[in-house]
Amino acid sequence: RDGRITAADATLRYQGGAFPGSPVEFGAMSAFACYDLENVRTIGYDVVTNRPKQAAYRAPGAPMAAFAVESVMEELAKKVGMAGIDFRIKNAAREGTKSSYGPTYGPIGLLSTLERAKQHPHFKAPLGPNQGRGMACGFWFNFGGQTCVSLNINNDGTVALSVGTPDIGGSRASMCLMAAEELGIPYDKVRAIVADTSSLGYNDVTDGSRTTFATGMATILAARDAIKK
């Protein structure tokens, strides 16, 4: 009655096309990941149908699960007489929450984001004709994986950073920023290049869920190692 969710249960059925391989696993893992729940059960079915094989594109599996869960969150909020944002704040995952898919969260920004959104003037501004205001929470993972970079400090104080992950959306710029911050030098002193395969150690697949995250960690460790030497 106080708005605290005690348990959550979901059954997901994802269409995989002519062959198995729908993103139902990611949907099941992310469905309740935004919330601090003591009891969770999620069942997923990878359904084969007479259609073309599907492929991943941007957080595969997660938006569909989020749409279903967030729609229910709004319904539950109304039933207990709470605003949707307050209901989410009440149940939001935070640092120390054991996620619905296993790991315990470190520092995450969901709760602070919701609280800031609630305080923003736009959230309380009167609505005009044919206007509405909605909100929802979503989740996606950062994946690690084997990653290798090479960082060299030149005689003129500039830094050459070789990475083995092709640039997708400015990832080289992110690596330069991380290296510069860790080394305590200006950003324009760092140059990142995508090196040949044979010049670096092994790198796992380059995709949007791991490139900046995993290559960034490797860059930071390489910079710290350079400082020690």
Where are these regions (language model features)?
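Gly/Pro-rich active-site capping loops and adjacent beta-alpha segments
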Residues: R1-A65, L127-K229
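N-terminal leader/propeptide and maturation segments of large enzyme subunits in energy/redox metabolism
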Residues: A56-K118, G208-K229
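Helix N-cap/coil-helix junction residues
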Residues: M82, F123, G184-I185
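Short, basic/aromatic recognition patches that contact phosphate-bearing ligands
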Residues: P103-W140
